[in-house]
Amino acid sequence: MTMKDTLPAISLTEMVGGSKVKMQYYGPNSLNEDGTFMPFSEQMAIISHYLHNEGTPYGNTYEKKALALMEDIYKAKSTSKSGMAADFNEAQQYSLFNDLYKVPFRPHREPKFTFIDLFAGIGGFRMAMQNLGGKCVFSSEWDAQAQRTYLLNYGEVPFGDITKEETKSSNTKRLTAVTEDLQATS
């Protein structure tokens, strides 16, 4: 039996499988700068944005925090399954959160342009931009059900309310295109 066979499976899509995410991982890296606990959805937004942008300047924005959060989650999962903590660095080689890549609308690896998706909803604007060759490097949506649908379609948890400082601080500050839902005004 290989190390890969003994590692606990960590599936983000299973974690959010219910009607509303009511989960929280507490670890040394799940604290905000002010000492409050970072909500699970924000932890998953950081991790999923990092994994989809790894190896790019956009991924660098999330790298340090994402790797620390992934280590917390991995240690919690492996300890609860086996009674002892496993080595995160070895586990990382076996693609934690592999299900983020098993989605219908994967991002382009070599995009023609980048964009952010504010007021993301379930991702209609993102789909149009991806069809034109773009790659989303930041998304935000405050509605929990829309976040879940977005995750299942794109493998990425959008950040939450963009009026909150912690969400603003996650933004890469590189804007190519943004949309706003105009249905209410039409």
Write out the residue ranges for each language-model feature:
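Conserved active-site and SAM-binding loop architecture
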Residues: 1-186
